[in-house]
């Protein structure tokens, strides 16, 4: 079996999921024309980051002939499965309020259950885990490292922007005051 072909197939599947997320998000924004979108200038960089998540590992694996390492793949796959489980839980919890854009919810739509009972931004934790682990399925460590660093820069700004927007809602401020951003009790 050609592990590179399987890896490229996984990247293709992730690309389709990302495209579906953008389509769903646009439809939700059209359904709420009054919605406040808080970070229009940052969004193109996020799109570029996620395009890079598909393109860079593929180029690294093919161009630099990264070998398939079963132990590394197994560890990366375990992280990816955990991240996917957290994503499903997060999206089921937040429901129709989820969007790829920073959209201020209605004041009565603040979510405090599911993973939001422990951290403010479970979906960003998912993205951190995905960006770190997806390239490592086939040893693309340069992609994992460089994309993780870029993601840290993007998320540091995006989280501040999102929290500034959500802090306009007293219910969000009160509910999230004692919760860490990404890791319960730590960060």
Predicted segments, located by residue:
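Long, highly hydrophobic alpha-helical transmembrane signal-anchor segments
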Residues: 41-74
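Cytosolic-biased juxtamembrane loops and peripheral soluble domains of multi-pass membrane proteins
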Residues: 23-41, 68-187
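Anionic, Ser/Thr-rich low-complexity intrinsically disordered regions
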Residues: 7-10, 175
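N-terminal signal-anchor/start-transfer transmembrane helix
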Residues: 11-26
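Alpha-helical transmembrane segments of integral membrane proteins
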Residues: 4-7, 46, 73-79
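Short, hydrophobic transmembrane alpha-helix segments
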Residues: 1-5, 32, 59-67
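Hydrophobic alpha-helical transmembrane segments of multipass integral membrane proteins
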Residues: 13-16, 52-53, 57, 78, ...
């Amino acid at each position: 079996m050609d592990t590179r072909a399987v890896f490229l197939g996984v990247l293709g599947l992730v690309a389709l999921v990302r495209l579906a997320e953008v389509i769903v998000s646009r439809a939700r924004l059209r359904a709420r024309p009054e919605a406040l979108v808080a970070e229009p200038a940052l969004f193109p960089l996020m799109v570029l980051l996620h395009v890079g998540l598909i393109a860079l590992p593929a180029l690294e694996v093919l161009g630099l002939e990264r070998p398939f390492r079963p132990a590394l793949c197994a560890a990366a796959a375990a992280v990816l499965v955990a991240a996917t489980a957290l994503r499903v839980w997060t999206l089921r919890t937040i429901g129709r309020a989820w969007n790829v854009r920073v959209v201020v919810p209605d004041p009565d739509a603040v979510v405090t259950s599911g993973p939001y009972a422990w951290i403010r931004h479970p979906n960003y934790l998912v993205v951190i885990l995905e960006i770190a682990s997806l390239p490592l399925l086939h040893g693309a460590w340069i992609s994992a490292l460089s994309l993780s660093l870029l993601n840290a820069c993007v998320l540091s700004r995006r989280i501040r922007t999102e929290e500034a927007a959500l802090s306009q809602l007293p219910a969000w401020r009160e509910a999230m005051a004692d919760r860490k951003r990404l890791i319960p009790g730590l960060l």
